[in-house]
Amino acid sequence: MFEEIPTARPDTPLLDEVNSPADLRAFKKEQLPALVRELREFMLYSVGQTGGHFGAGLGVVELTVALHYLYNTPEDRIVWDVGHQAYPHKILTGRREALLNIRQENGISGFPKRDESEYDTFGVGHSSTSIGAALGMSLAARQLKTGRKAVAIIGDGAMSAGMSFEALNHAGDVKADMLVILNDNEMSISKPVGALSSYFARIWASKTYDNIREGGRKVFSGLPSALELARKAEEHMKGMVSPGMMFEELGFNYIGPIDGHDMDHLLTTIANLKDRKGPQFLHVITKKGKGFEPAEGDPIGYHAINKIEPDPKPNVDKSKLPKYCNVFGKWVCDAAEQDDKLVAITPAMKEGSDLIEFADRFPERYFDVAIAEQHAVTLAAGMACDGIKPVVAIYSTFLQRAYDQLIHDVALQNLDVLFAIDRAGLVGEDGPTHAGVYDLSYLRCIPNMVVMAPSDEDECRKMLQTGYEYKGPAAVRYPRGTGQGVDIESTLSTLKIGKSRTLRTGQSGIVICGFGRPTYDALKAANTLDATLLDMRFVKPIDEETLLTHRDAKLIVTVEENAIMGGAGSAVSELLIANNINIPTLHLGLPDQYEEHASHASMLKRVGLDADGIQKSIELKLTHL
């Protein structure tokens, strides 16, 4: 058990010999426990150097070693769900040194990524995709007769999503040759029932039991009543000591629960399941943060950590600035005090969306639906139908998963639902899988929807209240990180729908339209260029009246932290075209490509959305007028 994150690189003589799983498979089984300890210690050290997710990874060290030891990777396909648990996998697959730059600019991704390594069989970041992807690989192997094996590793939280059960149902129906491993690190499905459960897990996974069962089916195939009696006896015995009957009903052979930190048990069980025909389901119990005492005691707090600084010198001013999620957390509590019809709904984002205080103060009005974004939106729609005022707190990247429900269940019926959309824009080290850079595009095309983008924390609070009081669906998209340091009104005041504000009036004939966070960087450019700056506030409805007063402008510039295609800039151009106004325009935003992980500041500079980049782009455009 480690009590501290090592700041000096540990000695790892066994791990140093592993540059690929082929090297691992040359080890004797007796060496694996020592390798596991070295792997866990190196992972602690490396994440301490860079920051990143490590709680889930610490919990699957033994499982990762067992899988790469027994399967012929990369020929056999191992698919990790979400990817938070894949750090040990990266270390064992030739990226040990690269882990020291994980999530850094030009470093490796924090998630499995197909173009990074042949061992990363499926790119992930969002949850609950592993079973469906592994099933697809299993069926491809069947059709192409490659003999490849497919394994999906999924956490108990991700198992709550409907997509997981859709894939399980299909896999059972087509009798796919695949193994699904449930990494249960919260014991949210069921606790193992002591020694009896462990004993039967070993028996059910054994080839002897499998042969007896198949032989019995053949012998009694002509005696339906006897076969049915045997099946029921097996079900009743499993049901006494096993939580897995649900998976059996879906067509899987369920094994477990077993101790995910018992290497001998893992090796024996997985080896027995590896060559079985048909869908297999292995339930392993692990400890999130295993081997690191603080993480075992606080698995949520240690889900991810920041870089360990040897001599930390915090920026005092920056630390005092509220994060946008904190602005939301304060507003939703204040609004709930004033209106007992307000409820908060979130798909497993209680901490990230800052709903901890709300859940404590208003437990009967707080609904965490787990990783079920589609259900979260339709649940809100149902509540709104009968007089409740739901606030859906959700990350921009995850709202994409509920787009049909957003249109069909909420907007089409013009229901009073407020979407508090966090992590809008670029999200730094989490990279393209978590970037919220499409919401302005996919929201503004939906009828009845009001779409707002705050430039600072006070605007964010006002927009949340505006959206809450609006009769119909409304969305406020706000970024990750801290605000601008402006004073925040304590009252629950609102804004006029579709009305911008002028932050600066210039004389150069340049009009800059800022949407959301980039507005303050645009202000710096506006001061240099003597440009007029509009904080547009509303992407939909756009402030037509104000924009049309600038029909004689030399250049209209739009700035947004969203995809340029179909975004806020497109809304401005559409307005100008509809009114036969021929003014040169410049749309600054995110190009038609995925932006790789880096610090947020580096990403803004890369795409030209920092103050200097905005100014240079405008100056370049002026040279072509």
Curated annotation (Swiss-Prot):
Gene for this chain: dxs
Chain positions recorded as Mg(2+) binding sites: D156, N185
Needed co-factor(s): Mg(2+); thiamine diphosphate
Biological or metabolic pathway of the protein: Metabolic intermediate biosynthesis; 1-deoxy-D-xylulose 5-phosphate biosynthesis; 1-deoxy-D-xylulose 5-phosphate from D-glyceraldehyde 3-phosphate and pyruvate: step 1/1
GO molecular function: 1-deoxy-D-xylulose-5-phosphate synthase activity; magnesium ion binding; thiamine pyrophosphate binding
Its EC number(s): 2.2.1.7
Protein's name according to its UniProt entry: 1-deoxy-D-xylulose-5-phosphate synthase
InterPro entries, A to Z: Dxylulose-5-P_synthase (IPR005477), THDP-binding (IPR029061), Transketo_C/PFOR_II (IPR009014), Transketolase-like_Pyr-bd (IPR005475), Transketolase_BS (IPR020826), Transketolase_C (IPR033248)
Role: Catalyzes the acyloin condensation reaction between C atoms 2 and 3 of pyruvate and glyceraldehyde 3-phosphate to yield 1-deoxy-D-xylulose-5-phosphate (DXP).
Subunit structure: Homodimer.
Keywords for the protein's UniProt record, in alphabetical order: Isoprene biosynthesis, Magnesium, Metal-binding, Thiamine biosynthesis, Thiamine pyrophosphate, Transferase
Gene Ontology CC terms: cytosol
Entry's cofactor comment: Binds 1 Mg(2+) ion per subunit. Binds 1 thiamine pyrophosphate per subunit.
Residues annotated for thiamine diphosphate binding in this entry: H84, G125, H126, S127, G157, A158, N185, F292, E373
Protein's GO biological process: 1-deoxy-D-xylulose 5-phosphate biosynthetic process; isopentenyl diphosphate biosynthetic process, methylerythritol 4-phosphate pathway; terpenoid biosynthetic process; thiamine biosynthetic process
SMART domains in alphabetical order: Transket_pyr
Family under the similarity heading: Belongs to the transketolase family. DXPS subfamily.
Gene3D superfamilies (alphabetical): 3.40.50.920, 3.40.50.970
Catalysis performed (reactions): D-glyceraldehyde 3-phosphate + pyruvate + H(+) = 1-deoxy-D-xylulose 5-phosphate + CO2
